[in-house]
């Protein structure tokens, strides 16, 4: 199992806009239905951090995959390219990058999982 994170550093106050993009709340955001139908996709979460001692916020996009190949197939798909503005003519024209300072992508192989023990009463 593979976990991919995209940690997006944004100016204070810009996180809600980024979150709306990934949840589709803008009406033109991340196609959550499309990713949910990708073979090998296991889950998607958004995390939001507001460090009090920093002048920025972070939105961490996490996705869980059966394999590296499954995740790479998503990145190569037309749905991914459309959602991320990677069409021939739109890459530099995207206004929805406002407030984004930078980002870092990391890949992790899951080496251990501990699930809760369910005790029947």
Swiss-Prot record:
Disulfide bonds: none
Keywords (A to Z) from UniProt: Cytoplasm, Heme, Iron, Metal-binding, Monooxygenase, Oxidoreductase
Listed GO biological process terms: heme catabolic process; iron import into cell
Site (Transition state stabilizer): 74
Transmembrane intervals: none
PROSITE patterns for this protein: ABM (PS51725)
Pfam families cross-referenced by the UniProt entry: ABM
Compartments it resides in: Cytoplasm
Catalytic function, reaction form: heme b + 3 reduced [NADPH--hemoprotein reductase] + 3 O2 = biliverdin IXalpha + CO + Fe(2+) + 3 oxidized [NADPH--hemoprotein reductase] + 3 H2O + H(+)
Main location: cytoplasm
Gene Ontology terms: cellular component: cytoplasm
Bias (Basic and acidic residues): 78-98
Family statement drawn from the similarity comment of this UniProt entry: Belongs to the antibiotic biosynthesis monooxygenase family. Heme-degrading monooxygenase IsdG subfamily.
Function: Allows bacterial pathogens to use the host heme as an iron source. Catalyzes the oxidative degradation of the heme macrocyclic porphyrin ring to the biliverdin in the presence of a suitable electron donor such as ascorbate or NADPH--cytochrome P450 reductase, with subsequent release of free iron.
Name of this chain's protein: Heme-degrading monooxygenase
Species per Swiss-Prot/TrEMBL record: Listeria monocytogenes serovar 1/2a (strain ATCC BAA-679 / EGD-e)
């Amino acid at each position: 199992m593979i976990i991919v994170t995209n940690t997006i550093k944004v100016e204070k106050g810009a996180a809600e806009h980024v979150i709306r993009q990934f949840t589709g709340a803008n009406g033109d955001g991340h196609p959550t239905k499309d990713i949910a139908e990708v073979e090998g996709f296991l889950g998607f979460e958004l995390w939001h951090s507001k460090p009090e001692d920093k002048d920025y916020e972070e939105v961490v996009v996490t996705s869980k995959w059966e394999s590296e190949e499954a995740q790479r197939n998503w990145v190569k798909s037309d749905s991914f390219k459309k959602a991320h503005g990677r069409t021939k003519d739109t890459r530099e024209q995207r206004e929805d990058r406002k407030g984004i300072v930078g980002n870092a992508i990391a890949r992790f192989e899951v080496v251990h999982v501990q699930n809760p023990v369910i005790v029947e009463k």
